């Protein structure tokens, strides 16, 4: 398999950025296929720290970086991120970055609607980043979205704005909010258009040509499988499909071209925002995981909820996502724990389950059944071979591998790019 698809196997924040960066030096093209600028990732390259939200990780290495049609693009956020990364010495030009001409745009009305819904008093918040991702996807499915290509045609742009505001202004009136001016929105989009259009391209063809010429493509997922709109902990999910199948639909390549699917999973669990979390810890162990793992969101700065590794739910996401191998990250965060617990089943209303139930109410009742493993005193930080790991750490990794029923392809032992133990090369598998 010449290509590799990287997806999160938990609730996001698994360390995909580092692994994508680690793999990208061997890739020719890096492509994003879903989400927006709501999920951030941090790359540590030498002494430089890059924080990206929308741009594919390959940009920091000068790789051709593609934003696929499955991504919703905030044009103002894109320009701001390009400017910020450029100030760190990264060269970003239309030759390096391509945006799908059919990608949906996130507009100011989407951000405002997102915030209005999260702030309402009569409903349960989802815990969104309030960046307009969900409302933009709603308009895409509703066939009224403004897309990148519309910026190139003033007449078409006015028609699209009229159509989308017919819907949104009705919503705004119902929420007690003033209507948005069509002239204002057209003016805002017309102003930003020259900064976006040079990057617009038929990315399906760009990727087809790359694959045809035997270039290696790295498909970069955002968030995680447990936030997938179909397969996640609904309704506490994102608004797109995050599993590997979306790599095809979200870029325009065929399913056979997504290649080796690498699922990223932390050696423990974290979650940002609302929703069920069976193994969540509210004690000193949970606090220690958060402090050691620096568990704060890149985009929002929100503190992440922490818990023990959940083998049940991770096994489920790996199967749904067609994952070939797992990258286990942040093993070093578990250094020093005398006992480490792993969830091996759930109990719901007295019944033992080997999967997460589909219903929101049943998920909230799921109580973890734990298996206790011995911790280790030595350090795993910076380890690059099995010989560098304490014996109990090796046993932990092997037990996780058995429980999730999927090979551990590599282990990450620090934020540093090269601190990786490789067992199975995704590009050669």
From Swiss-Prot:
Ligase is among the record's keywords: yes
Subcellular compartments: Cytoplasm
CDD domains in the cross-refs: AdSS (cd03108)
Gene that produces this protein: purA
List of residues binding substrate: 298-304
Signal sequence residues: none
Note accompanying the cofactor annotation: Binds 1 Mg(2+) ion per subunit.
SUPFAM superfamilies according to UniProt: P-loop containing nucleoside triphosphate hydrolases
InterPro entries (UniProt xref): Adenylosuccin_syn_GTP-bd, Adenylosuccin_syn_Lys_AS, Adenylosuccinate_synth_dom1, Adenylosuccinate_synth_dom2, Adenylosuccinate_synth_dom3, Adenylosuccinate_synthetase, P-loop_NTPase
Reactions catalysed, as given in the entry: IMP + L-aspartate + GTP = N(6)-(1,2-dicarboxyethyl)-AMP + GDP + phosphate + 2 H(+)
Protein's name in the database: Adenylosuccinate synthetase
Sites where the protein binds Mg(2+): 13, 40
Cofactor(s) this protein cannot do without: Mg(2+)
EC class (word): ligase
Family note: Belongs to the adenylosuccinate synthetase family.
Record organism: Maricaulis maris (strain MCS10) (Caulobacter maris)
Record NCBIfam families: PRK01117.1, purA
Classification via Pfam families: Adenylsucc_synt
Binding-site positions, IMP: 13-16, 38-41, 129, 143, 223, 238, 302
PROSITE patterns registered for this protein in UniProt: ADENYLOSUCCIN_SYN_1, ADENYLOSUCCIN_SYN_2
BP term (GO), one: IMP metabolic process
GO cellular component: cytoplasm
Pathway stated in the Swiss-Prot or TrEMBL entry: Purine metabolism; AMP biosynthesis via de novo pathway; AMP from IMP: step 1/2
